[in-house]
Each structure stands twice: as C-alpha cells, then as structure tokens.
Amino acid sequence: MGAVAGRTGGLTVRVADMGDPGVAPMLDGLAAEYTARYGHQAAERELTGTPDAAFSAPGGGVVLVEDGGRAVAGGAFLRKDARTAEFKRIWTDAARRRQGLGRRAMAALEGAAARRGYLRAHLTTGPEQPEAVAMYERLGYTLSSEEGTDPEGRRIYFAFAKDLAAPGERCADPGAGGHSGVRAGGASYD
C-alpha cells in the first residue's frame, strides 16, 4: 500500500507503485481512452512500452487521486535524467472530468517528483488529446518547438516541460483555485 500524500475535499491523494491494485482503474481507463482515440495497437504500445519497474522508487512513482478508495485521477513518473522526471499515464476518470481532478493529479505528480529531487518535469501527449494540451498549457507547461514535429515541421505529438517548485513551495491544496476545469474539443481532463 502506498503512502498517503494528503486529503482534500473528501479526496485522498497517495503515492503508490504500478503493482498496487488501486492503479487498475487508471490503467483500464487509459486503455479505453487510448484505444478510442488511437486504436488498439497504439494503446497497447503506449501502455506496455515502459516497464512497470521504471515507475518504482527511488526514481519513479504513481500518484492516485482517490474518492472512497477508488482512483478517479492519477498519473505516473519515471527518471528521464538526473534533473528531469517524465510524466506518463496521466488520467482522469471520464465520468469525473471538469471537477479539478486533473489539476490535483498534476500537482500531486509535481510534488512527488520534486520530493524525489527532480527539478523539471517533461511529458508528451498525442494529437488526439486537445483537452490535455490545453490543461498542460494552463498549468504553465511550455510546448517544445524542438520535439514532436516531423521533418516538414508538422506536429505529430506535443512535448511539454516545466520547472518544478521545491517541495516547501508546494500548494497545500492542489485543487484549490476556483477554476472550473480546462475545456477544449468538447472534453476535459481537469
């Protein structure tokens, strides 16, 4: 069982390992989402392309936002380099979007990565996820102009980066702020 990272608004935020049974709703939700947007083969490639062990301490972790003991949002991180955590498998339950859960998951990922000594976060998302692109931009992530384009300059995926705050600078309630959620393309991860 993972350590409890905090409790806000009736939600529990905790750090876990990929093998934790509480991660299953996140992985199932991601598989369904990726399959619907990119097809079965691409979904399988994305979800099996990184070994689960890469998301384990000391270099990685999984963050779950839970309501009543069930994951409603979350994500994972792993070591990209000594200074940079790569965020992957970022997810919000489709039935719970536009409630600030994506922001909570991202804040929890940033906090967990900073506590492990990372100074920067890197993440990528696909072209069929405009709501994710909008959320990352709103959260202060910078789109890379050097990564994610083909030789002709067409965008094939979106790569983002952000400097992480030191653990003492973290917001006490990552869901606070009164934002109604990021909306783009008729859906939202937030």
Regions found by a protein language model. Give the residues of each.
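Conserved beta-strand in the GNAT
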Residues: V62-L64, R70-R79, E86, W91
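Active-site beta-strand termini and strand-to-loop segments that position acidic
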Residues: E66-G68, K162-D163
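A short beta-loop-alpha structural element at the N-terminal edge
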Residues: L11-M26
